[in-house]
UniProtKB/Swiss-Prot annotation:
Protein name per its UniProtKB record: Diaminopimelate epimerase
Binding positions for substrate per the UniProt entry: 13, 46, 66, 77-78, 174, 207, 225-226, 235-236
Broad class of the protein's primary localization: cytoplasm
GO BP terms in the entry: lysine biosynthetic process via diaminopimelate
Metabolic or biological pathway: Amino-acid biosynthesis; L-lysine biosynthesis via DAP pathway; DL-2,6-diaminopimelate from LL-2,6-diaminopimelate: step 1/1
PANTHER family assigned: DIAMINOPIMELATE EPIMERASE, DIAMINOPIMELATE EPIMERASE, CHLOROPLASTIC
CC annotations in GO: cytosol
UniProt keyword annotations, A-Z: Amino-acid biosynthesis, Cytoplasm, Isomerase, Lysine biosynthesis
UniProt subcellular location: Cytoplasm
Gene, per the UniProt record: dapF
Enzyme class: isomerase
Source organism of the structure: Leptothrix cholodnii (strain ATCC 51168 / LMG 8142 / SP-6) (Leptothrix discophora (strain SP-6))
Active site: 76, 234
Reactions that this protein is recorded to catalyse: (2S,6S)-2,6-diaminopimelate = meso-2,6-diaminopimelate
Role, per record: Catalyzes the stereoinversion of LL-2,6-diaminopimelate (L,L-DAP) to meso-diaminopimelate (meso-DAP), a precursor of L-lysine and an essential component of the bacterial peptidoglycan.
């Protein structure tokens, strides 16, 4: 089977984008792993599938598959910006604002005049059962912020160089655990990231964020993504980090997030308001690829 694809990137988070608006795609997890493979396939953090929506008032369905595992996931912020540019650049929609549905939410995308894309990421989710996060038996850590019920939670990591880390827990349509670090360059992301990702307190696993606060309007961030490992940028991770920082009293309502792949701007007016993410989205190249009869396992 031959597929036409578009390779895109948003702040270094890279994607294979597939157009399924004209004909449905029936790909397996092994097929998505093959497309994401950087040696045998195209290479990408995630594979994005563009489908028409059957929901009234919604323009497209946005599906996301991890390039490493082939599993479908709930949300990807950097991918959402690339999704918006793809439908605009390929003539699928000429609307300034596009509404799309994911597996668990609706989001609105806006292509700015300068080519950047702003995504309305909806309101963050703090209820532990909905993240999901099991806090049974845990005692929240004291902190110097003003969380108003939003707390830091200790995670025990037996055998790690850091036997315990304190994390802020929330969902941006997908689960996040954010910890504050002194220096993201020296933070043990490769060691601690996978331990947090697969921690038993997160029954569906979690994206592990490492945030360095530079000022009330600027942070540096690294994210070990669920099912993908560390990526150059994570849009939902940037949103989660800023929301956590605001609720803990560390950050102002609009913050520049410096990732290894580029700059994202996150704005959140507080409880009851959506999170707005603005950043770049670019097409790298297009091509065609034959799926092997037996995809790389």
């Amino acid at each position: 089977m031959r597929l036409h694809f578009t390779k895109m990137q948003g702040a270094g988070n890279d994607f294979v984008v597939l157009d399924a608006t004209r004909a449905p795609l029936a790909l397996s997890a092994a097929d998505y792993r093959f497309l994401g493979d950087r040696r045998f396939g195209v290479g990408a953090d995630q594979i994005l599938v563009v489908e028409r929506s059957t929901t009234p008032g919604v323009d497209f369905r946005y599906r996301i598959f991890n390039g490493g595992s082939g599993d479908e996931v709930e949300q990807c912020g950097n991918g959402a910006r690339c999704f918006a540019r793809f439908v605009r650049d390929n003539g699928l929609s000429q609307q300034v604002r596009v509404k799309v549905e994911t597996v668990n939410s609706l989001i609105e995308l806006h292509v700015e005049a300068d080519g950047r894309v702003t995504v309305d990421m909806n309101q963050p989710i703090f209820e532990h059962a909905l993240i999901p996060f099991d806090s049974a038996g845990l005692s929240a850590r004291p902190h110097n912020g003003h969380g108003n019920g939003f707390e830091l939670w200790p995670l025990q990591l037996p055998g790690a160089s850091l036997p315990s880390v304190d994390v802020a827990v929330l969902s941006m349509g997908n689960p996040h655990a954010v910890q504050r670090v002194h220096d993201v360059d020296t933070a043990p992301v490769a060691e601690i990231g996978p331990r947090v990702e697969t921690h038993a307190r997160f029954p569906r696993h979690v994206n592990a964020g490492f945030m360095q606060v530079m000022s009330r309007r600027e942070v540096r961030l690294r994210v070990f993504e669920r099912g993908a490992g560390e990526t150059l940028a994570c849009g939902t991770g940037a949103c989660a980090a800023v929301v956590a920082g605001i609720r803990l009293g560390w950050l102002d309502p609009e913050v520049d997030v410096q990732t290894r792949g580029g700059l994202l701007t996150i704005a959140w007016a507080g409880l009851g308001h959506p999170v707005l993410m603005t950043g770049p989205a670019q097409t790298v190249f297009t091509g065609d690829i034959d799926l092997p009869t037996t995809s790389v396992q």
